[in-house]
UniProtKB/Swiss-Prot annotation:
GO terms for molecular function: DNA binding; DNA-directed RNA polymerase activity; protein dimerization activity. Pfam families: RNA_pol_A_bac, RNA_pol_A_CTD, RNA_pol_L. The keyword Nucleotidyltransferase applies. Its EC number is 2.7.7.6. The gene is rpoA. Homodimer. The RNAP catalytic core consists of 2 alpha, 1 beta, 1 beta' and 1 omega subunit. When a sigma factor is associated with the core the holoenzyme is formed, which can initiate transcription. One of its GO terms (biological process) is DNA-templated transcription. Belongs to the RNA polymerase alpha chain family. This is DNA-directed RNA polymerase subunit alpha. DNA-dependent RNA polymerase catalyzes the transcription of DNA into RNA using the four ribonucleoside triphosphates as substrates. The N-terminal domain is essential for RNAP assembly and basal transcription, whereas the C-terminal domain is involved in interaction with transcriptional regulators and with upstream promoter elements. Residues 249-329 are annotated as: Alpha C-terminal domain (alpha-CTD). The keyword RNA-binding does not apply. It catalyses: RNA(n) + a ribonucleoside 5'-triphosphate = RNA(n+1) + diphosphate.
Length: 329
């Protein structure tokens, strides 16, 4: 059925071709023309950089004080062992970090399958070689810390925060948390009914075996959708800064003239002239007050001194006086 010309086609997951246990091809179609590259590039970048996973972050090897040393009876030097440990594909359920141990003796390869761990830890590449012991008397013991994270975090990024409490012999490892090792995409032609200008997106993905390809696509799409949510509703959701409202008038101007504690004679003269608030008083001039019946120079001097003690004076101009709160009274 022919849809509206403005209606976008919605892609669907067409096929998951499992090339191997760690290699899959995921096909999505149909896509509007150009959307294959738009979505393919976005998903590719997220799958490479933003997938959560687990990685080795710290190692303690018995008898080893620093990474620039060797261990008797072990073919590889310590730096090479640390590099091999970065290749461990570990999956941890329900925890953010775990400690796993490795104890091996006797000539031969030491592999990931020799590691001892709890039931909530799964090693996806048990055949991965960590090192080689060169004689029957050789042995190696290590404690390996595995943490959950995202992306790539070099050991140098953690040195400054951990060096004060990190004991000698605890070796830091560059952490590659992403379970996706390689990813590429291709855009091919697709057809729906009479339309032949559509895209088909084929994502070619290799993982370390700890994440299912279909789940990886689902997680990447969820991350992308969450990041785009802000563009769906472009209203400014920032919390506005609360501006402190400054009072229109100095609070002292709103106080009654009785608070000035004038003499009874002076106070009565002011009330007779309907001067009830200090704000009313400071707007009067000396000439105006001297015209007030029974208010002489002595009372005027008293009023001026009391106002001056409060940083006020006669003859002040107050815009918008009286305020609404006083006017209503």
């Amino acid at each position: 059925m022919q849809g509206s010309v403005t209606e976008f086609l919605k892609p669907r997951l067409v096929d998951i071709e499992q090339v191997s246990l760690t290699h899959a091809k995921v096909t999505l179609e149909p896509l509007e023309r150009g959307f294959g590259h738009t979505l393919g590039n976005a998903l590719r970048r997220i799958l490479l950089s933003s997938m959560p996973g687990c990685a080795v972050t710290e190692v303690e090897i018995e008898g080893v004080l620093h990474e620039y040393s060797t261990k008797e009876g072990v073919q590889e030097d310590i730096l090479e062992i640390l590099l091999n440990l970065k290749g461990l594909a570990v999956k941890v359920e329900g925890k953010d970090e775990v400690i796993i141990t490795l104890n091996k003796s006797g000539a031969g390869p030491v592999v990931a399958g020799d590691i001892t761990h709890d039931g909530d830890v799964e090693i996806a590449n048990p055949e991965h070689v960590i090192c080689h012991l060169t004689d029957d008397n050789a042995e190696i013991s290590m404690r390996i810390k595995v943490e959950r994270g995202r992306g790539y975090v070099p050991s140098t990024a953690r040195i400054h925060t951990e060096e004060d409490e990190r004991p000698i012999g605890r070796l830091l490892v560059d952490a590659t948390y992403s379970p996706v090792d390689k990813i590429s995409y291709a855009v091919e032609a697709a057809r729906v009914e009479q339309r032949t200008d559509l895209d088909k997106l084929v994502i070619d993905m290799e993982t370390n075996g700890t994440l299912d390809p279909e789940e990886a696509i689902r997680r990447a799409a969820t991350i992308l959708a969450e990041q785009l949510d802000a563009f769906v509703d472009l209203r400014d959701v920032r919390v506005p800064e609360e501006k402190e409202e400054k009072p229109e008038f100095d609070p002292i101007l709103l106080r009654p003239v009785d608070d000035l504690e004038l003499t009874v004679r002076s106070a009565n003269c002011l009330k007779a002239e309907a001067i009830h608030y200090i704000g009313d008083l400071v707007q009067r001039t000396e000439v105006e007050l001297l015209k007030t019946p029974n208010l002489g120079k002595k009372s005027l001097t008293e009023i001026k001194d009391v106002l001056a003690s409060r940083g006020l004076s006669l003859g002040m101009r107050l815009e918008n006086w009286p305020p609404a709160s006083i006017a209503e009274d």
